[in-house]
């Protein structure tokens, strides 16, 4: 018997809706990354993109444990000498809350072209309104 290997063209992709209201950031991000990779499907193949589309709503209401709300800092470098920029979690949550979930999930996906394609299938919205009602996403409880 030959080993089954899923093909990207044969995969049926679902649309899943996740409400981030009151959820812990890391636990939510691991579930999203797992669904984007397709690990919840029986035909999972590591080298093929078979994951589902994910719509995340209420990104501004995400929670973190401990003192991370005050202490967590996100860093990025501009590429110029001495330009290491930083922003605190609480400032980022008020300014651009979808970035928090994007950074957490992107770090859990494979690096390279496959991971970039997986990441493009995640749509994050700040409040409970989203633009993907026509796709009829199924609610996924976490």
From Swiss-Prot:
It holds the Pfam family Ribosomal_L13. InterPro entries: Ribosomal_uL13, Ribosomal_uL13_bac-type, Ribosomal_uL13_CS, Ribosomal_uL13_sf. Keywords: Ribonucleoprotein, Ribosomal protein. GO terms for biological process: negative regulation of translation; translation. Disulfide bonds: none annotated. Coiled coil: none annotated. The keyword Kinase does not apply. GO terms for molecular function: mRNA binding; structural constituent of ribosome. One of its GO terms (cellular component) is cytosolic large ribosomal subunit. PROSITE patterns: RIBOSOMAL_L13. This protein is one of the early assembly proteins of the 50S ribosomal subunit, although it is not seen to bind rRNA by itself. It is important during the early stages of 50S assembly. Belongs to the universal ribosomal protein uL13 family. Part of the 50S ribosomal subunit. PANTHER family: LARGE RIBOSOMAL SUBUNIT PROTEIN UL13M, RIBOSOMAL PROTEIN L13. This is Large ribosomal subunit protein uL13. It comes from Vesicomyosocius okutanii subsp. Calyptogena okutanii (strain HA). The gene is rplM.
């Amino acid at each position: 018997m030959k080993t089954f290997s899923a093909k990207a063209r044969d995969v049926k992709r679902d649309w899943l809706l996740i409400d981030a209201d009151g959820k812990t950031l890391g636990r939510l991000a691991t579930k999203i990354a797992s669904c984007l990779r397709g690990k919840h499907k029986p035909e999972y193949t590591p080298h093929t993109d078979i994951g589902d589309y994910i719509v995340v709503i209420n990104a501004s209401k995400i929670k973190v444990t401990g003192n991370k709300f005050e202490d967590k800092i996100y860093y990025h470098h501009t590429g110029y000498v001495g330009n290491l920029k930083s922003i605190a979690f609480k400032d980022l949550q008020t300014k651009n809350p979808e970035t928090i979930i994007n950074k957490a999930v992107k770090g859990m996906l494979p690096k390279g072209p496959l991971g970039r394609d997986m990441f493009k299938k995640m749509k994050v919205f700040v409040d409970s309104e989203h633009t993907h009602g026509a796709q009829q996403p199924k609610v996924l409880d976490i």
